[in-house]
Design a protein with these regions (language model features):
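Sequence-level detector for tyrosine residue identity
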Residues: 2, 28, 65, 77, ...
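Histidine-centered nuclease catalytic patch
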Residues: 2-32, 41-55
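Surface-exposed loop/turn and secondary-structure junction residues enriched for glycine/proline
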Residues: 17-20, 28, 59-60, 71, ...
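Post-HExxH zinc-binding segment in Zn-dependent metallohydrolases
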Residues: 35
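Phosphate-backbone recognition surface of nucleic-acid-processing proteins
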Residues: 38
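Conserved, surface-exposed functional patches that form binding/active-site neighborhoods
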Residues: 45-118
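C-terminal, charged low-complexity interaction regions
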Residues: 88-154
Length: 154
């Protein structure tokens, strides 16, 4: 999912068929996307640098966090590279509906993680495990991923 929301209901050809017809049936070119990202944002866009290198971050081949930083409290992505900038623009990653959703998801997940930690400390592993399981089904998985990643940074 490009936007991180879990409303995937479309299959996108990452490299558009019009630009790469031989990749039409290439499994590595099929991405789950929400219909908004696929139809209204990306469409047939696939920007390239002057040397022909694709500018969109391919999350199946590289770590998006090398090009993007999620500002958790406001739910916005910040570009760390030209490729990150192109990815934000093409997919509309900072659309209001997404930034609000990520900000709310951050508050919710932070609260759930605090509750989980408290339950572990109180010796209640069963309820802590229930919270862990519920985190798997929260929208905006990119928020939880960023929280866990940033937790390990100095």
């Amino acid at each position: 999912m490009y936007c991180g929301d879990n409303q995937g209901d479309a299959i996108d050809h990452f490299e558009p068929i019009a630009q790469a017809p031989l990749r039409t049936f290439d499994w590595y070119n099929h991405f789950i996307a929400c219909s908004h990202c696929n139809s209204h944002q990306k469409r047939d866009l696939f920007p390239r640098a002057a040397d022909g290198t694709p500018l969109l971050v391919d999350p199946t081949a590289e770590d998006p966090y090398e090009h993007l930083r999620l500002l958790l409290s406001i739910g916005e992505y910040e570009a760390l590279s030209e490729r990150g900038e192109a990815t934000i623009k093409v997919f509309g990653l900072n659309r209001t509906v997404l930034t609000r959703g990520r900000a709310v998801a951050f508050i919710t997940m932070r609260s759930l993680l605090r509750d989980r930690q408290r339950l572990v400390q109180e010796g209640n592993p069963t309820e802590a495990a229930e919270i862990t399981e519920s985190l798997r089904f929260q929208p905006f998985a990119d928020v939880l991923s960023a929280m866990l990643r940033y937790r390990h940074l100095p």
